[in-house]
Amino acid sequence: MTAFTRFAHSRASWFILTGSAIALEAAALYFQYVMKLDPCVMCIYQRLAVFGILASGLIGMTAPKFLIVRILGAIGWAVSATWGLKLALALVDMQNNPSPFSTCSFLPEFPAWMPLHEWFPSVMLPTGMCTDVPWQFMGVTMAEWMVVAFSGYLVALLLFIVPILSGSNKPSLYK
């Protein structure tokens, strides 16, 4: 077993994934409440995708020696990062090519049985417009930085998918 595979089978690797998602969520809340930047609907959806990555990391951390746990974590990671990248690219397109015919809604379209914007309004209620670009760092907008972040998550998954799926590490209940 290689060191890379051992790392993929450790809690540390899943902890890093979880920690990076927590850092992104903390940054989002900092932008919203300290810098007073209003999140749009697409931002809220991306925030939910980051929560999906966070949850996937927590799943992987529970028992990373078991193949099924690593597979479930990797599936959640892949779905969340892909969905987040799709949303970030759509938001970049909206900001770069504003159109009165292509706008985002004022309220998120969560399922009726899971109205997150009503349950957690301080985190999931959008208050901004998608076409606004209120913040840039090094000439790159927040939406473009999220493209970088979600792309990074997908590249990391591609690097780790083979070690994650290798089942050579048999756990022992007596260690």
UniProtKB/Swiss-Prot annotation:
The record's subcellular location field reads: Cell inner membrane
- Specify where it is mainly localized: membrane
Q: Which UniProt keywords apply?
A: Cell inner membrane, Cell membrane, Chaperone, Disulfide bond, Electron transport, Membrane, Oxidoreductase, Redox-active center, Transmembrane, Transmembrane helix, Transport
Q: Which residues lie on this side of the membrane: Periplasmic?
A: 31-48, 90-144
Entry GO MF terms: electron transfer activity; protein-disulfide reductase activity
Q: Name one GO cellular component term.
A: plasma membrane
Q: How does it sit in the membrane?
A: Multi-pass membrane protein
Q: Which residues lie on this side of the membrane: Cytoplasmic?
A: 1-13, 65-71, 164-175
Q: Which domain of life is it from?
A: Bacteria
User: NCBIfam families from the xrefs?
Assistant: PRK01749.1
| Function summary | Required for disulfide bond formation in some periplasmic proteins. Acts by oxidizing the DsbA protein.
| Protein name listed in UniProt | Disulfide bond formation protein B
Species of provenance: Shewanella sp. (strain ANA-3)
Q: Taxonomic lineage of this organism?
A: Bacteria, Pseudomonadati, Pseudomonadota, Gammaproteobacteria, Alteromonadales
